[in-house]
A protein has these predicted regions:
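Compact soluble domain cores
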Residues: 1-93
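Short beta-strand segments that buttress and anchor functional surface loops
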Residues: 89-105
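Enriched for short, Lys/Arg-rich terminal
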Residues: 102-134
Length: 134
């Protein structure tokens, strides 16, 4: 039997498989694993979200726990040479946030882009991107 190319395997991910992956990710966010639950990369785009909007760690957790299968945009193999075989999950969703520095500001829907590495055994969940979608 011919081996499928990785991109063909990705397209073949069923809704059930995505749901299982999402449940694994959310279980880590909710319960923590190995004394830690997740970490967000200190990238400029990720920092900008916190500078522009009132967003606490609890709000980030709420957003992550609210992800659904329909928020998946892509599942792919990582291209990081130190982590071969890791799976990268990408999501897009809107969420109401209050902008900073605007007097009497109200909530506005912010399109978010979230990219995380599905951890292997004994690894924490690493969130590469958590910022406004471009």
């Amino acid at each position: 039997m011919k081996e499928l190319a990785w991109d063909q395997k990705l397209e073949a991910f069923s809704v059930l498989q995505k749901k299982v992956i999402l449940e694994e990710l959310q279980k880590i966010v909710q319960n923590g694993v190995y004394g830690s639950d997740y970490t967000i990369a200190p990238r400029d785009k990720n920092k900008q979200l916190r500078k522009r909007y009132y967003i606490t760690d609890e709000k980030i957790k709420e957003i992550l726990l609210g992800l659904k299968v329909e928020h998946f945009t892509k599942i792919e193999d990582t291209n990081h040479p130190e982590h071969p075989g890791d799976i990268v999950c990408k999501f897009k969703r809107s969420y109401p946030l209050i902008p900073k520095w605007i007097e009497e500001a109200d909530y506005e829907e912010v399109a978010l882009y979230i990219k995380m590495v599905k951890p292997g055994v004994d690894e924490v969940l690493f969130i590469i991107s958590f910022h406004e979608d471009e």
